């Protein structure tokens, strides 16, 4: 079968080696004669999977010992509610920085539980969309925390700065689309959360990193399944967890460690992004309207100069094994999501196709 490269924003491409191992173990895992999907989440075999996955994840991001790692349900949208329900405490307001679609979605959900102080960080610079630097973010004095999204998948906008607002500011961040793609200083955050379906594993799992002093503050109305303290006290098994997603994510963590960890991912992700943006920037046929300082390395939206060619581009690229390139309905055009599992070979195949498509239709 011809090589297929999946540029979907999520569920996203998984490492071929991981899929091969999962396929081999699907019906007979660990010599048990059953699938990992069929074993008890409280049995010693799966407990080992869970413990190894957490250890490997901690190793990859160098998570400090005073942070808890939770394996949860609910996705990023679940965390839009979980963060205020767990972290507000006796306060009624929180700072929210709006830099795109997902930040705005978090703000909308937070309004159910608190009064968000919203700072619009979006700006236009020389005709390109950009984000104001953190030094210009206006935070309030009485906020329980500050929330932002470092990578906007739909807009193709990234905020690569590391927060430095002082020890009294609890920073909560939605890392769903950029987790494990580069090193991060976890100690600068109070809460980090990430849906698994982009850089971690299959959909159905959400990972939360929470500083332990923030536990025990949950609103009385917080559903138990979203309560960080309850999840922590029950080793993320307050109810039956998504065991297969947990197992596969653990395999991805081992794949990452075997391939140089987040430092190596950082390097290759930069190479992939430079290759794709280079073709776009050196062409009048393609365009990207995000300022270079805020371009995402994970999600690259681009438009054709003649939108009438969009349908043909998508049809021909799909036939060439380049799948899921249609842009989000909010922005249109094309979008290539190039997460950790997307090899440089896949991006090279895309750029070769783009050059040839321009030659024939430009």
From Swiss-Prot:
Keywords: Amino-acid biosynthesis, Aminotransferase, Cytoplasm, Pyridoxal phosphate, Pyridoxine biosynthesis, Serine biosynthesis, Transferase. Its main location: cytoplasm. GO terms for biological process: L-serine biosynthetic process; pyridoxine biosynthetic process. The modification N6-(pyridoxal phosphate)lysine is found at residue 198. InterPro entries: Aminotrans_V_dom (IPR000192), Aminotrans_V_PyrdxlP_BS (IPR020578), Pser_aminoTfrase (IPR022278), PyrdxlP-dep_Trfase (IPR015424), PyrdxlP-dep_Trfase_major (IPR015421), PyrdxlP-dep_Trfase_small (IPR015422). PROSITE patterns: AA_TRANSFER_CLASS_5. It holds the Pfam family Aminotran_5. It is found in: Cytoplasm. Pathway: Amino-acid biosynthesis; L-serine biosynthesis; L-serine from 3-phospho-D-glycerate: step 2/3; Cofactor biosynthesis; pyridoxine 5'-phosphate biosynthesis; pyridoxine 5'-phosphate from D-erythrose 4-phosphate: step 3/5. GO terms for molecular function: O-phospho-L-serine:2-oxoglutarate aminotransferase activity; pyridoxal phosphate binding. Its cofactor is pyridoxal 5'-phosphate. Pyridoxal 5'-phosphate binds at residues 76-77, 102, 153, 174, 197, 239-240. It catalyses: O-phospho-L-serine + 2-oxoglutarate = 3-phosphooxypyruvate + L-glutamate; 4-(phosphooxy)-L-threonine + 2-oxoglutarate = (R)-3-hydroxy-2-oxo-4-phosphooxybutanoate + L-glutamate. L-glutamate binds at residues 9, 42. Catalyzes the reversible conversion of 3-phosphohydroxypyruvate to phosphoserine and of 3-hydroxy-2-oxo-4-phosphonooxybutanoate to phosphohydroxythreonine. HAMAP family: SerC_aminotrans_5. Belongs to the class-V pyridoxal-phosphate-dependent aminotransferase family. SerC subfamily. PANTHER family: PHOSPHOSERINE AMINOTRANSFERASE. This is Phosphoserine aminotransferase. The gene is serC.
């Amino acid at each position: 079968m011809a090589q297929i490269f999946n540029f979907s924003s999520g569920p996203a491409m998984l490492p071929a080696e991981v899929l091969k191992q999962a396929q081999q173990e699907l019906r007979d895992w660990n010599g048990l004669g059953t699938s990992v999907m069929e074993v008890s989440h409280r049995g010693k075999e799966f407990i080992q999977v869970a413990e190894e996955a957490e250890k490997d994840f901690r190793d990859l991001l160098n998570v400090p010992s005073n942070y808890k790692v939770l394996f949860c349900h609910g996705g990023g949208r679940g965390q839009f509610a979980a963060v205020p329900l767990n972290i507000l405490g006796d306060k009624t307001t929180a700072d929210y920085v709006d830099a795109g679609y997902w930040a705005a979605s978090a703000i909308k959900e937070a309004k159910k539980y608190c009064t968000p102080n919203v700072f619009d960080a979006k700006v236009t610079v020389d005709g390109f969309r950009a984000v104001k630097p953190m030094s210009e973010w206006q935070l309030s004095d009485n906020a329980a925390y500050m929330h932002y999204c470092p990578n906007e998948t739909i807009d193709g906008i990234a905020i690569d700065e590391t927060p430095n607002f002082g020890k009294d500011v609890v920073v909560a961040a939605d890392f769903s689309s950029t987790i494990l793609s580069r090193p991060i200083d976890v100690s600068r955050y109070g809460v980090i959360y990430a849906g698994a379906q982009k850089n971690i594993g299959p959909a159905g799992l959400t990972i939360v990193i929470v500083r332990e002093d923030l536990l025990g503050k949950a609103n009385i109305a917080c559903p138990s399944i979203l309560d960080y303290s309850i999840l922590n006290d029950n080793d993320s098994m307050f109810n039956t967890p998504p065991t297969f997603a947990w197992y596969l994510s653990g395999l991805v963590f081992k794949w990452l460690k075997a391939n140089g960890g987040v430092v190596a991912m950082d390097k290759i992700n930069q190479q992939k992004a430079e290759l794709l943006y280079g073709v776009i920037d050196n062409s009048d046929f393609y365009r990207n309207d995000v300022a270079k300082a805020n371009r995402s390395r994970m999600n690259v939206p681009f438009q054709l100069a003649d939108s009438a060619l969009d349908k043909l581009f998508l049809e021909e690229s799909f036939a060439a094994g380049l799948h899921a390139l249609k842009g989000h309905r909010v922005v249109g055009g094309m979008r290539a999501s190039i997460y950790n599992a997307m090899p440089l070979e896949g991006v090279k195949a895309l750029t070769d196709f783009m050059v040839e498509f321009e030659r024939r239709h430009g």
